Amino acid sequence: MIIDHIIKKIKLCLPIKYSEFQIHEPTFDKRDISNIKKCVESTFVSTKGCYIDSFTSKLKNITGCKKILLTSSGTSALFLALKAIDIDSCEVLLPSMTFVATANAVVNANGIPNFIDSSETSLNLCPIKLEEYLSDIAIVKNKKCINKNTGRVIKVLMVVHTYGDPVDLLSIKKITEKYCL
């Protein structure tokens, strides 16, 4: 059965004692709990406080960026990134194996999500399926990727490193360059 096959593949990606690690449940060590208590006691438990300021400062130093904007969630970060590049009424390619937040961010930023099949072995976006999809529906005009069926611009390809397994970015980069994504 396909579901058993998928579960088996997911378990192969996880640490040996996978039952000790929860994907959707937070785990906190003693230091984390101590820091959380400090935040609660300070009344800064959201998007402001000494930890936010410290982290922002460290990120500026590491990246060399003058401005850093932290968000309260990955969903918010995806939404802001998509708004910044103006995907309004454009199509966005996503892997079929992803968290709902990826597609939600696209829809909330007024984009149109299109799902590309994932690899059976890595569960990541499959470069072969991406190439097949684009060769069937895309044309490049004026350095823009256009869906010849809808007439809309395909502006973005979002990749997700499923369970921390890195996507084959080199193969995907060649494809995105070919199609001006």
Task: For every predicted segment, state its role.
Residues K48-E91, A105-V107, F115, I139-N149:
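Phosphate-binding glycine-rich loop
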Residues M1-V45:
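N-terminal "arm"/small-domain region of PLP-dependent enzymes with the aminotransferase-like
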Residues R31, S54, S76, V100-A101, ...:
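Short alpha-helical
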Residues I87-C180:
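PLP-dependent aminotransferase-like
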Residues V45-K48, H161:
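Short, flexible loop segments at the rims of nucleotide/cofactor-binding pockets, characterized by
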Residues D32, T56, D117-S119:
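Acidic active-site catalytic centers that drive phospho-/nucleotidyl reactions
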Residues Q22-H24, S72, M158-V160:
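Short beta-strand segments
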